[in-house]
């Protein structure tokens, strides 16, 4: 029987620090087939092109990064775009600015999934709307994955408890809120990641005065399934 500590480590894994020779620091959180990396890239630093068997998706949280996937390079500013590097497609980055860049990268290799991407590997904002009154969300969508940026209003704003068939991963990128998965509650602060498997009950509430912001990833898309189906049909 799992203890409370075991459950917390399952849903909210303790991040492990990885330090690279070029000064990049990454905090790695893993559950099953998926790794979340919170990366800090120093000014004027190169991340050399590399490739691996996992698909990798990511976006910039703070600052500006010159990101290259395959033979395509694009400047990525905070929360304005996302990238997908399919398995074995080279990808690298450079921080050309005088400021540290903070980025989120997610690596995943799960049996039965097909990892498609746009021809140029980058996703623009698909839509922004209110998911609930006062809760604005922004979406990036590909046929197998959906990224949702969400603002949870302060003073009691909440995402009511629910469950669904989608796997869901989230990272706090601003403010704070309480996140509960299957009765296990954690105070989310900047960089905290959670992992929620299909049909696991979960919800969130922001008890602070300031709004909070989070990045939420769904496998497969939850809110824009029609968009995903159109992309899938186009690929076939």
UniProtKB/Swiss-Prot annotation:
The keyword Oxidoreductase does not apply. InterPro entries: Bacilysin_H2HPP_isomerase, Cupin_2, RmlC-like_jellyroll, RmlC_Cupin_sf. Pfam families: Cupin_2. It catalyses: 3-[(4R)-4-hydroxycyclohexa-1,5-dien-1-yl]-2-oxopropanoate = 3-[(1E,4R)-4-hydroxycyclohex-2-en-1-ylidene]pyruvate. SUPFAM superfamilies: RmlC-like cupins (SSF51182). It comes from the Bacteria. It is found in: Cytoplasm. GO terms for biological process: antibiotic biosynthetic process. Residues 40-106, 151-215 form the Cupin type-2 domain. Gene3D superfamilies: Jelly Rolls. It is an enzyme of class 5 (isomerase). Binds 2 Fe(2+) or Co(2+) ions per subunit. Part of the bacABCDEF operon responsible for the biosynthesis of the nonribosomally synthesized dipeptide antibiotic bacilysin, composed of L-alanine and L-anticapsin. Bacilysin is an irreversible inactivator of the glutaminase domain of glucosamine synthetase. BacB catalyzes the allylic isomerization of the endocyclic-delta(4),delta(8)-7R-dihydro-hydroxyphenylpyruvate (en-H2HPP) to generate a mixture of 3E,7R- and 3Z, 7R-olefins of the exocyclic-delta(3),delta(5)-dihydro-hydroxyphenylpyruvate (ex-H2HPP). Monomer. This is H2HPP isomerase. The gene is bacB.
